[in-house]
């Protein structure tokens, strides 16, 4: 199967690893499903993050860095150190992990929420959020999205994610709204903005 065939597969569970030269950075996507597939075969994480695999892969292409995508997955892979997802990230050993997630808008306090997993690291997520907000301000299609990395203010704090809460690498958990995830023009601009920010880390 081709990469796009995997990412568009609405049924089969898979973990796909796409290598890249810049191993200082790694992109992770633990809950991908194609657009229109809202559910995962996972009791502890039944809601999918639609289309996040395509976004993560596009960002990894721009950065020429490794990308790891779990699609239609039967476990919640970023919550267990024993998962093949966690072990692959550990084997690569990046300095920075960028995890792409999606939300439906019902619980989020902001359109885009960024967490580094704990209050102690809030300064990192706030800095990334501020830079992304500044980048979005020059694009008419993006400037109205609200963005926060303030641990006190956001809903999706990623406190239970073991890929985020670790000292093995610096990690950012990025929650994206459905509207942005389903619009290629918008998510390509997002990826271009993130590429510039991440290269300067």
Specify the residue positions occupied by each region the protein language model found:
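N-terminal catalytic or cofactor-binding beta/alpha core of small enzyme domains
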Residues: 1-201
